[in-house]
């Protein structure tokens, strides 16, 4: 092997002359050098994810870089082949950047056939022209060695095309090129560049074929390198209108680099994205989003689409899951269906109603004398004939279809001389039989009740003939007002459904004066009271009338909605319905103002969803709490208005209703967190003017906390004490925003406000408290020509990556960064550790004064925020532990999975 590889010839000859066309990015279809000439093709791509780049102090990888199709029990490795050629050849592979055109990468390949600068070579031929690389590893460069390695790689590359050496001008040019590469290079992504060399006439391998480039390989320790995976969803179907809230559990994602994509896999190519903000991503493992509307509102049957997680920057996607859109339910409350139904007859569902009518008519003459033409007053004559108190059981004594039996009994009692049918009454029982006597007594009582019922019905009909008032008939039949049809609707329900206002008032009047108040609150099979239906159908006058006669507004329907909740969902009619409900004087009004629905939303939250300042004013005037948090996430009305980006509502809540601009959700987010996460300069400016706290931190740590195992032996005894304190820095609005305009607003506001008191120092160390001289020296070091963009990496390590674009054009980016870090409550140890990991030992020396050295703890554990896009793996070799146990790691990190 050594005979065919000269380690002094690393790199690719005449690299600068190569024109990397888009075909190189798709290596499975390479362009040959000539129409029928030899060319290089990738047979097996490397695996894109799951492989870890390792530092030199960690030792070699356990197993080489696997192939894309590698599985347990069937290992594959990156493989290439020279086509249209047979004979001796040499194939080399090195690392290049993932951007186009590909440039030399600072990381290096390691393996049995690899040189010190990371170029691996194998010989192939003369028959088998396939090369398999089965022991490749990726050596992660340290920041302090990055420039040196880049210059060496570029020099070797240039020397292959210019063996006579480099001039001083060319060396300076290479150094400048290395500096430019360092600024833009992503240390978490590499690609393999395969190059083939055929044997020339002089016996050397100096005839190059066109290189081919592999697909990107992501460092498994990089925040954005993990495979996207949907673990669970609480809903797999929703309305075609969208807006359904879905809780999705997933593997680790980045708040600012993830989206939920809905799409159809057909010729239309429809796609849409779930609606959520960075604050809806919970600790990188759960996303709460609202479904987008389907592109067709009118569908006749359910439609199944797909959804997947997708990274915004890299475009990586997860496996797709199915989601079903169901047709729009226009008549959710089934009012229209019931209106289309034919009107019920008296025989349905009461049974025998027509016979009852005939019987009553036949008996009217017999009761004429008793009626005596007396007037009802208010149904006094009808009530006088009631044989049982209100609430007794006439329905039980009056079985359906029994009209004929009732009238027969009445004839026998009133006109015995006319020969009533004997089977209608029990036969005479023999003397001395108690059971027979008891049966006879019950039969007589039954007939007496039937007689009273018939008499009352007859009197009601007579009174109706005198007064022409339908309430006379209703009073006589008031016990039937509780009758329900197959949908559970009473006569009052049906009158409201069909909009019969006069009938509604008559029935309600009778119910009220007869003290049959239970009827007014009866529910149908959909758990709807008459008041619910009056609100659903928008009958404001009926709502007021029902409340006056005792309707209970606190009762809930099957969805958990009270009449007030339904009124707030009534669209344009909401203010009038709300007036009727709240101005009725009902004793339950204070109670319904503080009742949530089944989704945990209070009336003030529904008023925000209705986008109605008028409804908000009505609710607050009647005693609703504008600061009430909804039960799912603790959001106030101001939080919801901010999420909806309703500038008018936010202004109304802040200026007129004096909502608390610093109210917090269960996760500690203020409205300013939400506005910043949405990237809305207008809302941000409004909230800042209203006094929003720019320094407010939510409950999600900016940097993951150390595991309990790193806290020492005293962790158990100190645990309860630690639980009472907050020992980490959460995300501020500035940490959540990706908008340059919002960042500028927040930074300007931060400079114009006094610094907040620092949080209790975390276990990592004391707060950042340094003199101006030390900070100025560090600023000069980071902005100096030797640093070349180190401040940007420092920002990422300090969890302030969102500020990089903002500070890039400032006179002193590092100075602005350090001031923001200090303002945010950053600790000294975090800064020292970041500088040390970057190899900036001079900066560590500047900061480590006698007054701070003794304060530093022995443990140094720090991980990056989930908001970065590149790997921030600890890089300083000086922090590597001595070779105690095999596989020990640098910087106190827990043992990762090794590949």
Curated annotation (Swiss-Prot):
Post-translational note: While translation occurs, the particular unfolded structure after the GRR repeat promotes the generation of p52 making it an acceptable substrate for the proteasome. This process is known as cotranslational processing. The processed form is active and the unprocessed form acts as an inhibitor (I kappa B-like), being able to form cytosolic complexes with NF-kappa B, trapping it in the cytoplasm. Complete folding of the region downstream of the GRR repeat precludes processing.
An example molecular function term from Gene Ontology annotations: RNA polymerase II cis-regulatory region sequence-specific DNA binding
Known tissue expression: Highly expressed in lymph nodes and thymus.
Modified residues (Phosphoserine): 23, 161, 713, 715, 717, 812, 865, 869
Compartment list: Nucleus; Cytoplasm
Superkingdom assignment: Eukaryota
Residues the record lists as Phosphothreonine modifications: 425
ANK repeats: 487-516, 526-555, 559-590, 599-628, 633-663, 667-696, 729-755
Motif (Nuclear localization signal): 337-341
InterPro entries linked to this entry: Ankyrin_rpt, Ankyrin_rpt-contain_sf, DEATH-like_dom_sf, Death_dom, Ig-like_fold, Ig_E-set, IPT_dom, IPT_NFkappaB
Composition bias, Low complexity: 887-899
Segments for region (GRR): 346-377
Bilayer-spanning residue ranges: none
Domain RHD per the UniProt entry, residue ranges: 35-224
GO terms of biological process kind: canonical NF-kappaB signal transduction; extracellular matrix organization; follicular dendritic cell differentiation; germinal center formation; lymph node development; non-canonical NF-kappaB signal transduction; response to cytokine; response to lipopolysaccharide
Keywords assigned: Activator, ANK repeat, Biological rhythms, Cytoplasm, DNA-binding, Isopeptide bond, Nucleus, Phosphoprotein, Repeat, Repressor, Transcription, Transcription regulation, Ubl conjugation
GO cellular component terms listed in the entry, alphabetical order: Bcl3/NF-kappaB2 complex; cytosol; nucleoplasm; nucleus
Positions of region (Disordered): 403-434, 698-734, 851-899
Every Death domain range: 764-851
Chain positions of site Cleavage (when cotranslationally processed): 454-455
PANTHER family xrefs: NUCLEAR FACTOR NF-KAPPA-B P100 SUBUNIT, NUCLEAR FACTOR NF-KAPPA-B PROTEIN
Function recorded in the entry: NF-kappa-B is a pleiotropic transcription factor present in almost all cell types and is the endpoint of a series of signal transduction events that are initiated by a vast array of stimuli related to many biological processes such as inflammation, immunity, differentiation, cell growth, tumorigenesis and apoptosis. NF-kappa-B is a homo- or heterodimeric complex formed by the Rel-like domain-containing proteins RELA/p65, RELB, NFKB1/p105, NFKB1/p50, REL and NFKB2/p52.
Domain notes: The C-terminus of p100 might be involved in cytoplasmic retention, inhibition of DNA-binding by p52 homodimers, and/or transcription activation. The glycine-rich region (GRR) appears to be a critical element in the generation of p52.
Protein name from the UniProt record: Nuclear factor NF-kappa-B p100 subunit
Species of origin: Mus musculus (Mouse)
Gene name of the encoded protein: Nfkb2
